[in-house]
Every structure is written in structure tokens, then in C-alpha cells.
Amino acid sequence: METHIKTVEFERPDMLSEAQSGASCVAHAWAKVPPVLSREERDELKARIKRLLKEREAVLVAHYYVDADLQDLAEETGGCVSDSLEMARFGRDHSAKTLIVAGVRFMGETAKILSPEKTVLMPDLDATCSLDLGCPPDEFAAFCDAHPDRTVVVYANTSAAVKARADWMVTSSIGLKIVQHLHAQGKKILWAPDRHLGSYIQKQTGADMLMWQGSCLVHDEFKGVELDLLRAEHPNAKILVHPESPESVVAQADVVGSTSQLIAAAQSLSAQEFIVATDNGILHKMRMAAPGKRFIEAPTAGNAATCKSCAHCPWMAMNALTNLAEVLETGRNEIHVDPAIGRQAVVCIDRMLDFAAREKATVRPQGDLAANAQLFQGIGPA
């Protein structure tokens, strides 16, 4: 089946709306990453944040890719460390009226869409996502309008405005089943924005998919040739790969899965060494889940090559103790979603959740994908 592609570069300033300005370029994002603090400064800030969370009756929900201190704080204060949709579902179901989302902007938007009555704050509103930036709402709407015969399926890593144009939102755990379901009905699909995940699903299902060519800055930089060389140096290591990675990397994986599933694999498999092809923020949780095991970052640069992210998202790195404390003190950086857009966007999210409930599946964002190797059989959803 031929795959058609729509391309938009995520770093072109002229492609960005006013709402998407700020740290849209990678260099700008890295420049906004707060400085490293001493242990004494970190301890003081953590104590202050714990006090402020109680005073505000707020709960902290954090992604696996943010700073380890923020992940620990979320768990220590009764919050959540997880994938983006689970973060939003946790926030929706929690009694707190204020949600502090440590992650990137689309995660805050999804939390607000699912909890419109709650206040959603983020440490830095400029913390965005290359997949989100690479799929501007106006361009995407025009693309959809040009192909009215196709069912629009979008990945969770998109803006509220893009979700508002979609028939389905998917995570990778349920994405395969949803695309199989649509394919069985004879539906032709318009997929956005991640080309690697879309290509993987297309090959698994044989569906007719018209694809937008977006990519995650972090995962797109993993190198297949260098990964093969690294594996030769560590022949007993198992390779854990996030499905937003290039095909040459996915093809070498022992386990393909989401952040949660990769953590589960690291904990459950008997191997003592793992090569990990996803954001290195996940290594904090992996080491906690599998103490004593060794985790090696998959290569992001080869001969004469450089990396922009070097296995860590610059926008995730913008979340820090300093701006988290400031947001709790000031109440600034509130996420707002136009109510009309929110009402439209929630339709595709609820459609996925209803489908998942019927399938009795556990749904998580950022690519909960069944592994492509027998090594992972018997390991349940994380």
C-alpha cells in the first residue's frame, strides 16, 4: 500500500500562530531551561512546593520525561507520574480543583479538555512539542478539507484545535486496533502527525493511510547504523524502542512500546542490560523499577552527525522546581482552551475511550504499543 505524505517543518517561524510562539525553536527552548541547582536549593524548593500544593489544594501530574525531582514530588504528594492521557484522566478523576501539569503544552490542553471546570497550570507555557508544532491547525484543516472522504485519526501529541478536526484520537496502544477496526469497515484514513508511528501501524494493518509527515525531535534522532554497532558491543542487552523512532531503529527492537510498557519490560525481563531508544528522562523510573540493571542510551549521532535533542526533549527540560514553585505562588501560566474547540476535541477523545472500554484495553498516550517480539509476551499493560 502506497503511503502518501504531507510535510510541514516544525521550526519554521512563519508557520506558527501567535499562540505557538515562544520556545518554538530548539535553541530557544534550551536557552529557557532553568539552571542546575545545588542540593540545598533543591531541597528548599521541594519543601516550599509541598507546602504550596497543600495550600492551593492542588495536585501535581508529571510526565516520565520531566526532571526526576518533579517525578518524585508528584508521587510524594499524591499526584501522578505517567503518560499524557493517563495524566489527564488522573486529573479528571482527582478531587483537586487545580491541576499542575509538568510536561508539554498539549498535555495541559488535554487535561483541560477532560476537566474544563478545573484550573490547569503549567510551569512554562512555552513548553511545546515538535509533533504539535509540525501540525499547524490551519494547515491541517486545509489538508482535511482537501480529503473529505477520509476518516481523520490523530495522535495524542497534537493541539486542541487539531483534535477538534479529528474523528478519532488514538494512543499507540489502541491505535492499531482502531485502525484495524476502521480498515475492516473500508475506511480510508488521514493520519497525523507522527510519520514513524503511522508507518508502523500502516504496515501492521495494511490500511490506506494518507500521512502527515511529522516527527518527534527526540525519537527522530536515533540512528539505526550506530544502534547496530552499539548492540555488537553489548550482545546480551535487550533493545527497548519507542514507536516514534525511525524504522531502522524499530526493526532492531526486542521490545517496542510506550514509556509505561518499556518500564514494565525493564522490570520484568531477565536481561541485566538494556539499550533504550526514547527520551532519557525515562531512565529515572527504569532504575527505580529495576534496581541493579544497567541502562544505556541509544545513539542519537553518528559519524559527522550532531543531535539537537541528544535523547532529551528541550521542552520537557523547561519544567523545573523553580518555575513550578513560581506558578504555585502566583497562579500564572493557566491553560485555556476555547470552549467551542474543547467541546469538539473531546468527541474524538471520548470515542477512543469508549472503544477502549469495549475492547477492555488499558489506554495510555505516547505510544502504548504491543511489542513486536516474543520477549514481551506475558507482560501486561503498565
From Swiss-Prot:
It comes from Ralstonia pickettii (strain 12J). Keywords: 4Fe-4S, Cytoplasm, Iron, Iron-sulfur, Metal-binding, Pyridine nucleotide biosynthesis, Transferase. This is Quinolinate synthase. Its EC number is 2.5.1.72. The gene is nadA. The lineage of its organism: Bacteria, Pseudomonadati, Pseudomonadota, Betaproteobacteria, Burkholderiales. GO terms for cellular component: cytosol. Pathway: Cofactor biosynthesis; NAD(+) biosynthesis; quinolinate from iminoaspartate: step 1/1. Catalyzes the condensation of iminoaspartate with dihydroxyacetone phosphate to form quinolinate. Binds 1 [4Fe-4S] cluster per subunit. It catalyses: iminosuccinate + dihydroxyacetone phosphate = quinolinate + phosphate + 2 H2O + H(+). PANTHER family: QUINOLINATE SYNTHASE, CHLOROPLASTIC (PTHR30573:SF0), QUINOLINATE SYNTHETASE A (PTHR30573).
